[in-house]
Amino acid sequence: VLKNILVALDGTELAERVIQVLGDLVLSAETKIVFCHVFPTPESELELSADRPHPESPTLSYFHVEKQLQAYQEKLSIQSAIELVTGEPADEIIRLANIYKADLIIIGSRGLTGMKRIVQGSVSSQVVEEANCSVLVVKSK
């Protein structure tokens, strides 16, 4: 039984797909969902990867993201929480998963390939490698 699920959302259209997949899971009444969003630090934004918000959308304000996560929360019939943090996205997702003793992390991946992936890196790949629990990676299509 999945008791704690961390859902990492980045504020893009991929977040909707992640929420769809969450809705497809059969969850028990005891399951707790933690929606999280990591605001990248200025240093990590310089090396923006595919799994992070696009630089042309700096309007992803704290308030906007919080409202979006609250809207997802309202769709759930089970216990949930919201975590908005700042830092290196993969590191913060793993840190939150450890704090909440997550049994599963759900994260989106835009599927960068080739040189872009090598240069920019991938938050989802790093989370898969370093997490202490299972990770469900949701593809954009």
Each language-model region and where it sits:
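Small/aliphatic-rich secondary-structure junction motif
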Residues: 2-52
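Solvent-exposed polar/charged
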Residues: 24-27, 74, 98-99, 129
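Active-site phosphate/pyrophosphate- and oxyanion-stabilizing loops and adjacent acidic/basic residues
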Residues: 20-23, 70, 125
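Structural beta-alpha unit
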Residues: 73-105
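General small-molecule cofactor/ligand-binding pocket signal
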Residues: 34-36, 81-85, 136
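A short acidic, glycine-rich active-site loop
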Residues: 53-64
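Gly/Ser-rich helix-loop-strand patches that form or flank binding pockets
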Residues: 4, 96-141
